[in-house]
Structure formats: C-alpha cells, structure tokens
C-alpha cells in the first residue's frame, strides 16, 4: 500500500484520481489495501474502483479501497440488512420528483453508477429500482446477466 500518511482530514483525497495527483503516480501504479480484508488490490481492482467512482476511505491516516470479493460480499450484506422498498421507474420519478436521468443510481451488486441506458432498461423490462440504505439502486448490464430470479426480486 502507498504508505503516505494523510493526517489532516480536510486535505485527504476522496477519489483515486485525486489521490493519484497528490502522490504523483499514475492510477495503475497505486498500491492500496482493501479496507475490509486488508489484502493488496490488484491493478484490475484499482482500475475498477476508480471506474466505479467509489470514495477512498482512510484508516489511521492511510488510504484504502475495496477488493472485488469484499465489494460483492458487502454489497450483498448491505442489500440484506438495509433493503427498504422497490419501485418501478415511473413511481421513482413521481416519488423523488426528479427524472431518472437526474438521479444517482448505483448497481446494488457491484456499485457501478448506472448509465442512462441501464436506467431505461429497467423501465423497458419492467424491472424495479430498490432503495437500500437510503440510496436508490438497480442492476448494471454486467450484473443483470448474473442475477437470478430470486435476486432480482430482492
């Protein structure tokens, strides 16, 4: 892991791109540990963490990300513990008084931000969005294929 200590909480980079600028390293040269299992993230996991636009977390002043296994595992735990409700796209727009395109919706499985096309697919295929831990979620195209009938019903 990059052993740069960030003691001042106000100056800590929140994204991997910001962290790269501060430590003056390209993205794929960053060495981060997983905040959950403490294993070193692979180059692929670092890239995926940046693509997913998740926030860097700090423990004792050091930056951490999350590995693929822990991300999927803790997303499942989060879904099981904090599921609130499920609604169709039109209902979600009425409930929030915002268009789907203006809502920040992540995949409940892998945490990728949903694209406008993925949000539209939910409407076209009459799939629901899920409120989990006070956030609206759905399925990205990659996870859509991996979801079973019981999982899609949340």
From Swiss-Prot:
SUPFAM superfamilies in the cross-refs: E6 C-terminal domain-like
Main subcellular location: host cell
Zinc finger boundaries on the chain: unnamed: 34-70, 107-143
Pfam families reported for this sequence: E6 (PF00518)
UniProtKB keywords: Activator, DNA-binding, Early protein, Host cytoplasm, Host nucleus, Host-virus interaction, Inhibition of host innate immune response by virus, Metal-binding, Modulation of host cell apoptosis by virus, Transcription, Transcription regulation, Viral immunoevasion, Zinc, Zinc-finger
InterPro entries: E6, E6_sf
Oligomeric and partner information: Forms homodimers. Interacts with ubiquitin-protein ligase UBE3A/E6-AP; this interaction stimulates UBE3A ubiquitin activity. Interacts with host TP53 and EP300; this interaction inhibits TP53 activity.
Function comment: Plays a major role in the induction and maintenance of cellular transformation. E6 associates with host UBE3A/E6-AP ubiquitin-protein ligase and modulates its activity. Sequesters tumor suppressor TP53 in the host cytoplasm and modulates its activity by interacting with host EP300 that results in the reduction of TP53 acetylation and activation. In turn, apoptosis induced by DNA damage is inhibited. E6 also protects host keratinocytes from apoptosis by mediating the degradation of host BAK1. May also inhibit host immune response.
Name listed for the protein in its UniProt record: Protein E6
Originating gene: E6
């Amino acid at each position: 892991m990059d052993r740069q200590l960030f003691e001042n909480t106000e100056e800590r980079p929140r994204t991997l791109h910001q962290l790269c600028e501060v430590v003056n390293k390209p993205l794929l040269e960053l060495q981060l540990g997983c905040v959950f299992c403490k294993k070193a993230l692979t180059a692929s996991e670092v890239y995926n963490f940046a693509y997913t636009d998740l926030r860097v977390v700090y423990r004792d002043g050091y930056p951490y990300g999350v590995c693929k296994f822990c991300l999927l595992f803790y997303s499942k735990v989060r879904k099981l513990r904090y599921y609130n409700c499920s609604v169709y796209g039109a209902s979600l727009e009425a409930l929030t008084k915002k268009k789907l395109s203006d809502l920040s919706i992540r995949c409940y499985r892998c945490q990728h931000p949903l694209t406008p096309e993925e949000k539209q697919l939910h409407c076209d295929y009459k799939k629901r969005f899920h409120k989990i831990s006070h956030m609206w979620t759905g399925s990205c195209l990659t996870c859509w294929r991996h979801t079973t009938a019981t999982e899609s019903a949340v």
